[in-house]
Amino acid sequence: KPNSTTTFTMEWDAVIPHQIRRAGRNNREGIDMTMTQWYPKIAEYDYDGWATFDYIGREFHAPFSDFDVSIKIDKDYVIGAGGTLENPLEVQGYDAKANIKSDNKNKATWRWTAKNILDFAWAADRDYTVEEFTILDGPKVYYVYQKSEKTKLWEESKPYVTKFFQLMNAAFGQYVYPSYSFIQGGDGGMEYGMCTMILGEGRSLEGLVGLMVHEGGHSYNQQILAYNESVRPWMDEGFTSYYDDYVMHQLFPPKEPVANPFVGSIKSYVSFTNTGKEDPAVG
């Protein structure tokens, strides 16, 4: 009933598969676990009815929720997640003064909270490094990744990510959450509540920043505005692509100045429509 409350208590078992489309263990860059779409989820009910479509490797939609998550794992792991770590002094990676607490099985418990987000995702690896920086009038940003020669561009990307949030906040509205985490994991790039999972090796600086800009841009649509991508996929990817062009044009100005940074996307769209494969945007 409207304005009523129901409490569900659930127990479930699951096997973490080898890395599949979005989640799993031992991805191609050696990340131990990428834990996305990992728990039974309550379906969202909105103007389109119940959102009961599968989440497997595809878009997802869910109710805004508050999360209080405890994860017990071997104490030598470092976890990256979307949310606020409530006990950084009891686990490794987030505070140099940490006194890691573990039980008699050498397991530590991590406690994360997050308010009013669509989904809680996390990843764990024994070789993660955690770096953080705070953006003026913006979120605290966390980088959680395997620091090596293959990921050296992460350090160089920080001023670009800072500028990304500043440009987005000025042009499209304030990012409303206290933090955002870029986490090395998964199989490409996928956004979740207050974080994204991305592959972190190789690429050029512009390629890495472009991936971060795209996935971070989703936070303004798929997460804050909560477009249902299964019903209107063009709204999330379309607006996020618009953000991409707007931001990247300023972060990496073309050698030959162009009056309209969206010309390339417009030409691609026209080319696609000429194939006759275009579906109606609304229908």
For each predicted feature, which ranges?
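Glycine/proline-rich low-complexity spacer/linker segments in large multi-domain proteins
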Residues: 13-63, 67
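Zinc-dependent metallopeptidase catalytic helix centered on the HExxH motif
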Residues: 197-274
